[in-house]
């Protein structure tokens, strides 16, 4: 299934982060460079804040809710 242990480690790390709700910045940057090379991409801090707001609604629309 995996070509080597490094690839397996990366895959399992991504899966674990998704399970606990930590966004994957490296995949975001890779996606932006591949699919939108003409657009600037967010810094890690901007990306993390945007993902938190998208997940929990911290932009003033309904307060902080997870459920």
Curated annotation (Swiss-Prot):
InterPro entries: Sel_put. One of its GO terms (biological process) is DNA damage response. To E.coli YbdD. This is Uncharacterized protein YjiX. The gene is yjiX.
């Amino acid at each position: 299934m995996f070509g080597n242990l490094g690839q397996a480690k990366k895959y399992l790390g991504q899966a674990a982060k998704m399970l606990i709700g930590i966004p994957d910045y490296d995949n975001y940057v890779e996606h932006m460079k591949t699919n939108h090379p003409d657009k600037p991409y967010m810094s890690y801090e901007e990306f993390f804040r945007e993902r938190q707001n998208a997940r929990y609604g911290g932009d003033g629309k309904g307060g902080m809710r997870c459920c």
